Each structure stands twice: as C-alpha cells, then as structure tokens.
C-alpha cells in the first residue's frame, strides 16, 4: 500500500475494500474539496477525521494534510485509490 494507510478491510469475497488512510502533504488530494477530486466511479468517501472530530463528508469538505479518511472502493479501483494517496518523491 502507498501513502500512510492505517487499515484495510476486505468486504465480501475481496470484491471491495474499506481503506483508512492519513492524508500526507504530498498526496494529490491534500488541499482539495471532495467534489474536485477525481475519484473513480466505484469509490465513496465514508468519513473524514479532522483534528480528532469525525465528520460526515460532503462535496465542499476540504481534505487537508493530517486528516484521516475512510474510503470505500471496489476492487477494480484500488490501484487508482493508491495513486491518490501516494506520497510524491518530494516527501523524501
């Protein structure tokens, strides 16, 4: 797994996953509103933990560095989700 993934939970016969990940400053989604992120069709944001407070995500929710997000993803979209969580080379 790429980025700062905290947990992965398989659903069904590995047809889908719930991914819990901390957003890093170099992630392509850091600083963006959920509605502006190009998530694959089979991906839903289930929750956002900001400064210890769990929020129900809406389109205007801005994903910031340090947030913990819970994503539901169909198995076919996992690679793209990993790319969105990926740490860029500038991080090292």
Feature map (PLM): residue ranges:
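Cytosolic Rossmann-like ligand/nucleotide-binding regulatory domains
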Residues: 19-85, 92
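Flexible, Lys/Arg-rich cytosolic regulatory linkers and terminal tails that connect or flank
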Residues: 1-26, 89-92
């Amino acid at each position: 797994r790429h980025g700062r993934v905290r947990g992965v939970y398989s659903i069904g016969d590995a047809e889908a996953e719930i991914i819990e990940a901390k957003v890093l400053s170099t992630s392509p989604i850091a600083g963006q509103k959920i509605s502006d992120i190009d998530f694959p069709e089979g991906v839903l944001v289930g929750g956002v933990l900001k400064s210890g407070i769990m929020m129900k995500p809406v389109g205007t929710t801005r994903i910031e560095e340090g947030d913990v997000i819970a994503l539901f993803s169909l198995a076919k979209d996992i690679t793209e989700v990993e790319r969105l969580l990926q740490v860029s080379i500038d991080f090292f």
